[in-house]
Amino acid sequence: MADRSAIQLIDEEKEFHQSALQYFQQCIGNRDVGLDYHVISVFGSQSSGKSTLLNVLFNTNFDTMDAQVKRQQTTKGIWLAHTKQVNTTIEIDNDRPDIFVLDVEGSDGSERGEDQDFERKAALFAIAVSEVLIVNMWEQQIGLYQGNNMALLKTVFEVNLSLFGKNDNDHKVLLLFVIRDHVGVTPLSSLSDSVTRELEKIWTELSKPAGCEGSSLYDYFDLKFVGLAHKLLQEDKFTQDVKKLGDSFVMKGTENYYFKPQYHHRLPLDGWTMYAENCWDQIERNKDLDLPTQQILVARFKTEEISNEALEEFISKYDESIAPLKGNLGSLTSQLVKLKEECLTKYDEQASRYARNVYMEKREALNTKLNSHISGTINEFLESLMEKLWDDLKLEVSSRDKATTSFVESVAAGKSKIEKEFNESMETFKKLGLLISNEEITCKFSDDIEERIKQLCDAELKAKIGRIKKNLVPELKDHVIHLLSHPSKKVWDDIMNDFESTIKDNISAYQVEKDKYDFKIGLSESENAKIYKNIRILAWRTLDTTVHDYLKIDTIVSILRDRFEDVFRYDAEGSPRLWKTEEEIDGAFRVAKEHALEVFEVLSLAVTSDNVEIIPDVPMAEEESGEDNEIYRDNEGVFHSRRFAHILTELQKENVLDQFRRQINITVLDSKRSIITTRTHIPPWIYVLLAVLGWNEFVAVIRNPLFVTLTLILGATFFVIHKFGLWGPVVNVVQSAVGETRTAIKDKLRQFVVEDHEVKESFEMKDFSKNEQKEK
């Protein structure tokens, strides 16, 4: 190829072109391409029209074969061309990306004969460096193994995995299968399904390296299929099909756009040249690419085929034979051994005629697949056994005689029983060769049993703590509220004594020594101490919440008022007082007030009778770890202390005293008013005097019919309004009537003033007109 628009990137002697970077610089000039470029390769049989397709699609000038002269190899090595023009059905005016096209030497050519080393390395190189690999094939080649390059693709896939399979990225390559001379008799979907099935089958049969055993074909490749009409017999349709194909290379944002981000190598253009050269060097120098002879290839193919047939027969019998036996160890192991031996025997009978090293290699691989398949059943059996044994253990623990057997003893006995039965079953599988290694299973079993026992212990502990909490919290609340609602000077001594006794009563069953407890679930001394500490924390938090929620300002005022009224309103024997003089009221007031305020300071600050502040012996919250957090500010800007003993601030204390004084002052005033009312009531003789002196007027009224009628009407009206509470509507009606009357009067006055003003203006205008006439 002598065209100046392309260079031979890799020549026939497998040498990489050392001036590739200069070629790229010539193609792009001074433009900063960055990542806005794409690489496409074409791969296929010799003389299948690869170069022709590239020239029509990308407007390149690769050399093509003249079929009228001779069918021979045209492209030698790997050629590279640059283009920005793609043949499409639509005009794209915006700036198109730079595309670099690799034309790979055709496979299965007579020039190289049986030397297939270069074509396989070239195909591997194309996959390694390209975003899109166009696989050019004829429709009649689909279904063939050698003719459609499936054998070559299998080798390339395998080596590609070994070289690039462990890369920790999501890079993929698009395999674009272009089916030539597609006449449409067989739908494209059917052809694509056939090729896809062949590729998936090839992938499952690959010898995958460590770390890639579970990989899928679609982890590394995406598949697309396009059909093209016959170039000579259907030239117009061929051109139209190529243009439609070109649309997928330029129409960004569409579903069929081929240059997806995950295909790009994310390297600048000069970095790509270095990457491509390093890839070729790795492919060329890797010893694993020294391909075996055709005889070894045949042996590998046939032994793989025999192995797959034996494995398929094994799998077809497996589920039906094993399903009824999964719960019986003896029957299950016998059937597994039988099925495995039948599969290996069938393989040995047919595959032992081929090369021994290949035969043994595939036999080992088959044995591994069988063990892998069987291991699922073994794991399922062991898991089922584990669940059954665990259910038995839980039943034994829950139904034990708690008077003679402790929780710890029951769990320990059950654990020993589980381990013994599980290990015996696992050894049975191992002796029969069904289980190669039991270390992983044993480790998993040990971790599982320890985790389950821990969960069982946690559940038992949670139940015990729940029972303690269920009794402890309500008892504390009830006792504390009762003591605070009827406080004495030693109320905090009483509360703390009750607090300690309530805790002790609820956990006395677990006490072994003074301040030492054992909750009987197999915990260490430090763990038991931690649980005891948590119970005390719960108790202190309950006490703290109860005290501070109950002793609010209104509650304390109510307590003080009740203490005041107990002394002020009732005597020593509990009888209500009857006041006679104000001096008696004032004396009782002073005594009652002093009695009430005796507990005010007690309710403001939690201190014992020895005047020692009550401080919790355990941290009630994380905030208590630092002294800076003891004081906080509320939404109203008032500072408070988080310390348990500090109940009221100074400002709150003043508020309590103010409310208390107002309430007791009202009580005293009411008492004094009762004395005044008693003294100032109207004597009965006044009513007799009024009747005697007003008798004549009363008789005059009742003798006059008009007065009697008006009196009855007004009395009945007053009774109805008062009886049904209609004073509000009556007042509204009166107010409305008065308002309407006032408005009407204002309108009349306004109208009168306006009319008077208009009359005056008319007289003035007449006088003004007369004066003008006189002047004229």
UniProtKB/Swiss-Prot annotation:
Key words of the record: Endoplasmic reticulum, GTP-binding, Hydrolase, Membrane, Nucleotide-binding, Transmembrane, Transmembrane helix
Keyword ATP-binding: no
EC number, as in UniProt: 3.6.5.-
Binding site for GTP: G44, S45, Q46, S47, S48, G49, K50, S51
GO terms under biological process: endoplasmic reticulum membrane fusion
Membrane topology note: Multi-pass membrane protein
Protein location: Endoplasmic reticulum membrane
Parts of the chain on the Lumenal side: 703-705
Function statement: Cooperates with the reticulon proteins RTN1 and RTN2 and the tubule-shaping DP1 family protein YOP1 to generate and maintain the structure of the tubular endoplasmic reticulum network. Has GTPase activity, which is required for its function in ER organization.
Name of the molecule in the record: Protein SEY1
Organism of derivation: Saccharomyces cerevisiae (strain YJM789)
Gene (name only): SEY1
